[in-house]
Amino acid sequence: MMLPALLVLVLITVLPFIMLIAMSFAKVRLLGGVSLSMNGFGNWSDVLTDPATWHSWGVTLLFFVLAVGMEMIVGTVLALILNSMRRGQSLAFSLVLLPMFLAPITVGLLGNFLLDPTIGLYSWVMESLHLVGAHQSVFGSQTTAMLAVTTLDMWEWAPLVALIVLAGLTSVSPSVLEAASVDGAGYLRTLFSIVIPSILPVLLVALLVRSMDAVRYYDIVHITTGGGPANTTWVISLQLNEKVQATAVDGITTLIGQSAVIGITMLVFTIIIANVFVRVLDRRGLMK
Amino acid sequence: MDKTQTDTGMARRTVLSAGLGAGLGLAALGLAGCTPSAKTSGSGSGWKQFSGTTINFISENTAPSAAIAANSKPFEDLTGIKVNITQMALENLVQKVKLDMSGGTSQYHVVYADPYQVLAPLSQGLTDLNQFVNDKKYPPVEKGLADFIALDAAGRFESKSKLYALPYDCPTMIWMFRQDLFDKYKSKMQADLGFDPTPSGKITWEQYYQIADWFNKNAKADVPYGTGHQAKQHDSLQCDFSNVLWAYGADYFDVPDIGTVGSQNPGKSTLTTPQALDAAKFYDKLLKVAHPSSTTWDWDGLGNAFAAGQVAMCPNWHEYAATNEKSLPGKVGYSILPTGPKRSANNWGGTGIGINANAKGNEQGAAWLFVNWATSPATQVMTLKSAKGGGTPTRTSVYDMAEVKKAEKRPSDMPNMLTASAVLEAWKPENIGLRPKVATWNQLDTIVYTNLSKMIAGSQDPTTTMQAMASQFDKVNG
């Protein structure tokens, strides 16, 4: 009964994963069909001693903290606002969710358009508010480029956090909130003493989902900054892609083996992050 | 590199043929003898032999491909072959072609073979077109291979014995400037700067800098900045910088013919020569007076900014002339790029189209018919006229056509031809700029534009930048 499903699973996940591991220990040639010639730990040592790869990991971690942090805060605030609305909640909810349904590449293109210093609406607003100089692009400055791509990611994915948190908020017992109100607890006291603790498992799930995704961030940064300026937004996915595109001096051997190593390290990082969150949930008895 | 044409007809052609023959090593001249002279595409036999076949053509999203995609019906009527055209950014194309060639099958039968990012690293995945050129069962290449401009640079790698692609487009970097603003301010600028600022090959890069700076300080009412550059951390940054590098007498490698047929053994880089360091220092200085958004523009971004009146001048690919004429009709002039201590260098960005070696049977034949048709003079004239943006013909004969010559002056129904005199000058051997055709170019390209991006962002000084590039080049090339 389960066999067909297992076979499909093997085909689409296990075999490619095994291939990925094999490639990480091999020189990969593509022309005329994929062929591997074992290379020991050559790819691993090349990647692990490559300053560019470590730099891109640093950039990724910065993005990770900024993006996930902003998404959690903004998403939670959005959910609280939506939850408190008595009228028009459905309409507002639909509008808030819209960015989430856009392809990331579209978000990047939108960002390029809206933040274009010549024709971009957001650029015009920021220039009017003296937040940026005349004709300055936020994507062109080392100090603002990361913030810009992070904000675009937040714009797209904070709604997902809002959706998850909103689901959690509906589970907060009205009688408990009523009791807090009767006891004279203010909004902030109620929020931090009752609401947040009640939805903590949901918040951690949202954090887990977004964290796993943030490591793979690629589309928006690719289309907006290309990793620049001066490599300030060169995330690990761009580094991986760079290796995929590269060819060795013989014109035949690719550097896909090195990109496989980077892919595996990304996977390991994601697993570690996921495990940390799961342990936190488990320690607090929230996994049940 | 590529192109042709002029006011003096034969004289221009003679100059170009001689120039390309000598400077670009056009093996085409030698091959011409074994190429059957052809009639017109569409005439003769052999076009219908693969009727009913469907082929796929993958191309960068360039003006010629947009024009052909919008008007491929003549090919389908002529051959009965259905052609699907997919267009995308070059970096995505490279990835798709590489994966396609690795599969043993061919999803894409006709491939836009960028000489640096596709042809050099993947030449072994492309079919040698000589088998079709010399096979009588196929319609001959109209006017022969000798009619092509830059056949070696666009179509060969390492050896002149094999031909992997036929030249398909040939954008070249030239100096685009607001003629109306130069006319308006010429006398004042000349008085202030002490030289005639009229754009031409006589203007030095240092003077270009001074002109840009002058616009910044004296013409804000008309244009925000004097110069703009495609200085995003992207392939475009390397293209823009290369013009200056060559103008200063430096190069990436010191290997003969590395820009035409290429090499798999480029050896040590030459990016730390005094000339290279001077070029980097100047480029760093130039970018300091450029439009601040230059660091976010690739060629498209720069083209749009110029068309939007953001800069008075810029170096960009000549195929943007069509866009300029729509946005700034009659207001844009064209010249070869300024000269450096050594020469004027104008980056050639031409590309050929080739056939995936994995294509089977009828697909190969049908693909060849498409390659032959798409690069034929008649098709190139069609793309020149296209409202989709205009082509950049790769046939000498096209530039000699009366209607094409007429289009060199306004009003022109082939706006790209307004750049003809500049481009013709740019293609002369002494002015052409050819990037090194090596298998590792994708890696080297990234090294160049990443380090340059650090330099113009102020994170690295020019000397450190060039030293970093050189050491990384040498590491990649062993």
Walk through the language-model features, giving the residues of each.
Chain B
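Extracytoplasmic "Venus flytrap"/periplasmic binding protein-like
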Residues: 73-149, 165, 184-186, 190, ...
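Short, well-ordered beta-strand elements
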Residues: 51-62, 82-86, 110
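Glycine-centered hinge/linker elements that transmit conformational signals in sensory
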Residues: 207-216, 244, 248-296
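Hinge/lid segment of periplasmic solute-binding proteins
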Residues: 42-47, 115-174, 240, 333-335, ...
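Extracytoplasmic/periplasmic substrate-recognition and gating elements
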Residues: 56, 73, 102, 161, ...
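C-terminal capping/gating helix-and-loop segments adjacent to ligand/active sites or protein-protein/ligand interfaces
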Residues: 34, 294, 412-472
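Short, polar/charged alpha-helical segment
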Residues: 62-82, 180, 448
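N-terminal secretory signal peptides
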Residues: 1-11, 22-29, 373
